[in-house]
Amino acid sequence: AGASYFSQEGNMGRLDYDRWNFRAGVNANIGKWTKASFQISGDMGEQNNARNGISGGGTDADFNSLMTHLPFVPDYIGGRPVVYTGMQNVSSNLTAVQLYNFRAVQNSPDNTENQTNNMSINGSLEHDFGWFKWTKGLKLKASYSRNIVNGKSNNIGTKINVYRLLNRGGSGGHLYTGDDIDLDESNFGTFTLDNGNLLTRTMNKTDSYQMNLTLSYARQFGLHNVSGLFSIEKAESEYEYVTGNITDPFSFTDGQSNSTATGATQTTTFSRTES
């Protein structure tokens, strides 16, 4: 038997990962002619990271945002997340990538949470009929295995206000830092970064099992070897999932469906398959 724990934090923004693994097993002889075995193993994991709802999302998009961020443009000015609007300080037609502010997203409730929970069970019981002279070489074995996989994903994506500095500093009016920067609210133009504008929750489960009954015979009579095998197997598997999403969450949402604006659109999808 054994168990292990693994934890990791990101060196780039908000990222937490935790995972537990466990395993146990036993093999036993029940008298001279019968033996049994049993094993159980599983894991539980959870990952949380800030949600990047643009350019494909994920940590790769975050890395790209940081690599292409202009070093002379601070993330915040006067407590407001700012974006670079070009040498001409344009006020429209900015793409979502241009509006993306890495720190603003990191400081928002926007989050992706993935949880997994897996378990495997295996057991067998075997009996040797060698205790009776007419059934020597005859063995009967029954085995059972089951696998259960559970997954859950929660996503929070809001709309975040980011800002354009209307009158920049310096003699050329292009600097974002300096003592001459006007920090009054009137010197900031507002843009909206759409980082998904929805809440989603997805849950899925896969449950499968297999049973085998095997009758085998192997015996030598003088110069002759006689053997045979008979087996019966039964297996079933089922999968089901449910997904729900709702639009227009508040900027202070806690990820629940009641923390959204009036008139938000809510949808639910679910399915189940068996084999």
Say what each PLM segment does.
Residues G2-F6, L94-I156, G196-S227, Y239-Y241, ...:
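Outer-membrane beta-barrel transmembrane strands
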Residues G2-N49, N118-I121, G222:
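Transmembrane beta-barrel wall of Gram-negative outer-membrane proteins
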Residues S7, S41-G45, R146-I148, I232-E236:
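Acidic, glycine-rich active-site loops and adjacent beta-strand->loop/helix elements
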Residues N11, K32-T34, N48-A50, K133, ...:
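Short acidic, gly/pro-rich beta-turn/loop elements at beta-sheet edges
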Residues N11-R19, R23, N27, T112-N114, ...:
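Alpha-helix N-cap/helix-initiation motif
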Residues R14-R19, A104-Q106, I156-K159, N245-I246:
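"Short basic amphipathic alpha-helical interaction patches in structured regions
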Residues D43-N93, N150-D182, T243:
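A surface-exposed, glycine/aromatic-enriched loop/edge motif typical of exported proteins
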Residues T158, V162, N167-S275:
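Outer-membrane beta-barrel transmembrane domain signature of Gram-negative proteins
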